[in-house]
Design a protein with these regions (language model features):
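Residue-level recognition of conserved beta-strand positions in structured domain cores
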Residues: 40, 87-88, 122
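Beta-strand elements of well-folded, non-transmembrane domains
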Residues: 92-96, 111
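A short, polar/proline- and glycine-enriched secondary-structure boundary/capping micro-motif
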Residues: 96-99, 130-131
């Protein structure tokens, strides 16, 4: 039984938010497992913690320079004793450039507990449709 699935998910999402807002790709990649899968907002698949960290540093240095994000956990539930499925929403604020503006997205995360604690094994980011 996972104790506090919401607490685990909130902590990991909070680390992502802090790393994004500090424009720190290395710190953004840290909560991910070494073999994590990340599907970005454009549907591109990134494999592994190093690729996730490097890819985020690249966007922090270019199209998302000086941007900020706010994540909010929507739900988290235990699938197995060492597996949590979580959903969050995020609001990205980009001050300038070709992607300037506010963008809302929903994230699905698979969290795994291993020898080094809880890590993000899967992350899928999807734009929220505007109505």
């Amino acid at each position: 039984m996972v104790e506090g699935a919401e607490k685990v998910a909130t902590e990991l999402i909070g680390r992502l938010e802090q790393a994004w807002n500090e424009a720190d790709g290395r710190a953004f990649g840290e909560p991910f497992s070494a073999d994590a899968d990340f599907v970005d907002i454009r549907g591109e698949h990134h494999s592994g913690q190093e690729a996730i960290a490097a890819g985020h540093q690249a966007i922090f240095d270019s199209i998302y320079r000086d941007s900020s994000v706010d994540y909010e956990l929507i739900q988290a539930r235990e699938l197995w004793s060492d597996v949590i499925l979580a959903h969050a929403t995020g609001v990205l604020r980009v001050p300038s450039g070709p992607l300037a503006g506010e963008h809302s997205a929903m994230q699905s995360l698979v969290l795994l507990r291993g020898g080094d604690g809880w890590k993000i094994a899967g992350f899928h980011n999807t734009l929220v449709a505007s109505h």
